[in-house]
Design a protein with these regions (language model features):
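Conserved beta-strand hairpin/beta-sheet module of binuclear metal-dependent hydrolase folds
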Residues: 1-36, 153-167
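Active-site environment of divalent metal-dependent phosphoester hydrolases
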Residues: 3, 24-25, 49-54, 76-80, ...
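Divalent metal-coordination and catalytic microenvironments
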Residues: 9, 19, 34, 48, ...
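Active-site neighborhood of phospho(di)ester-bond hydrolases with catalytic His/Asp-centered motifs
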Residues: 18-21, 42-50, 70-73, 143-144, ...
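Active-site metal-binding motif and surrounding structural segment of the metallo-beta-lactamase
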Residues: 25-71, 192-197
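Metallo-beta-lactamase
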Residues: 80, 84-143, 150, 158-159, ...
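Accessory terminal helices/loops
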Residues: 106-107, 192-198, 206-282
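An active-site-proximal "capping" alpha-helix that borders the catalytic cofactor pocket
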Residues: 177-202
Length: 282
């Protein structure tokens, strides 16, 4: 799949890198930027553990071994559960001989990331929301529990009016593979209550406040439709209509398929599956 958005923040002590992508070409751009700036990467912030945002960690840390990694502890549960299961499925796909050369390369790169799991784990765990000074730059690191993942980190830079949302905001369709949809709704409420002027989503184009509010409205309407007696077709069509401004031309059919998949597997599945990635009682 595509790489998530990466963001560099300049700090007095060096560069802060938010998310490291998946593919070698993406990694090379990140390393080239740091070299061109003449500053070391002194900190990585991972918004969440999905491999399209974290696979580059190992290579960045190899180039800058002193860098700290700020992330939630959700990676531990992911390594024991979702990522282990995904690896087993991927290995079976490789063994079937049906994978294209590009797919095989991507799978092997993901496996290499899992084999170097320490690079995915935080050296500075984000266990609660709060102000932090990273490399001399004041930032607010916010923890959204049980949202797009078990622990999503979103960053607010008050001085710049900048909010980096990770996959809590994904232009074309919310990626619900490991999501608790209602927890995610709450995270979007917290973002809306933050006085940012510019928002960087996990995938897609940079948004202003009004664009974010429109996307959040589309997200809420999709959940509300799924909770109603509306049909799958009506709910998917509603997403496509409400989020049309964020869906790249030519991606409409793919988005419909993805929205339909998440409708079936996350929003309109049985209660146990629907709450699989939500906080468990007791």
């Amino acid at each position: 799949g595509p790489d998530g958005n990466s963001v560099f923040l300049e700090a007095p002590e060096g560069l802060i890198l938010v998310d490291t992508g998946r593919h070698p070409a993406h990694r090379d751009k990140l390393l080239a930027y740091a070299e061109a700036r003449g500053k070391p990467i002194v900190a990585i912030v991972n918004t969440h553990w999905h491999l399209d945002h974290t696979t580059g960690n190992a290579d960045i840390l190899a180039a800058y071994p002193g860098a700290d990694v700020y992330a939630s502890l959700a990676i531990d549960g992911a390594l024991a559960g979702f990522l282990r299961e995904s690896r087993e499925k991927a290995e079976a796909f490789l063994a079937s001989g049906k994978a294209s050369a590009e797919q095989a390369a991507e799978i092997r790169r993901g496996h290499a990331a899992l084999d170097d799991a320490e690079a995915l784990r935080p050296t500075v765990p984000v266990t609660a929301s709060g102000e932090r000074t990273i490399a001399g730059r004041a930032l607010q690191l916010n923890l959204a529990p049980y949202a797009a993942t078990e622990g999503d980190v979103w960053i607010y830079d008050e001085a710049a009016g900048l909010l980096i949302a990770g996959d809590l905001v994904v232009g074309l369709v919310p990626f619900m593979d490991t999501a608790c949809p209602e927890g995610w709704r709450g995270a979007l409420d917290a973002i809306a209550a933050t006085p940012f002027t510019t928002l960087v989503p996990g995938h897609g184009e940079v948004m202003d406040r009004q664009e974010f509010l429109a996307w959040r409205g589309a997200y809420n309407a999709f959940l509300n439709c799924a909770a109603s007696t509306g049909t799958k077709e009506a709910c998917v069509a509603g997403w496509q209509r409400d989020a049309a401004a964020f869906i790249p031309e030519g991606d409409e059919e793919r988005v419909a398929d993805m929205a339909g998949y998440y409708f079936d597997t996350r929003l309109r599945s049985g209660q146990e599956e629907r709450r699989r990635y939500c906080a468990q009682a007791g």
